[in-house]
A protein has these predicted regions:
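Positively charged, small/polar-rich N-terminal and surface patches that mediate targeting and assembly
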Residues: 2-133
Length: 133
């Protein structure tokens, strides 16, 4: 039994690391954070950003005249690095929470992560993603 547990820990430590970046509307952040926490995501970085996609932002007017060109809209960027939670699970949760069927629901980007280093302890890889930091 102990041998199986060690094999599982070794597999987790050598597991592929992935970074999921979600760009979405600010008002969806709290609900998404709660949903991700329920599936075991216990860390993320959130940044206030601006951007536009298909919706091209809202129309801007200056002294009653429409100003051409897209307007940057406020969004949030959520960054998550995982090893033990399947990327597909995180993507599914994000899609369920963010979907309205309207333009501007957001985007999800998935990247491979080569390495991670915890500065305080020097731990790398899987171990750097564990613990209280």
């Amino acid at each position: 039994m102990l041998h199986v547990a060690r094999q599982m820990m070794t597999a987790a430590r050598t597991a592929k690391m992935s970074k999921i970046v979600v760009i979405c509307k600010q008002e969806k952040l709290a609900v998404l954070q709660s949903a991700l926490n329920k599936i075991g995501v216990n860390g993320m970085t959130v940044t206030q950003v601006q951007g536009y996609g298909t919706q091209k932002g809202n129309s801007q007017y200056y002294r009653g005249v429409r100003v051409d060109g897209p307007k940057l809209l406020p969004k949030v960027k959520i960054e998550i690095v995982v090893t033990s939670i399947p990327v597909e699970t995180i993507v599914d949760v994000c899609k369920k929470v963010l979907y309205t069927g309207q333009i501007g629901d957001g985007k999800i980007f998935i990247y491979d992560v080569e390495e991670v280093v915890k500065v305080r302890t020097g731990e790398t890889g899987y171990d750097a993603l564990q613990g209280d930091d």
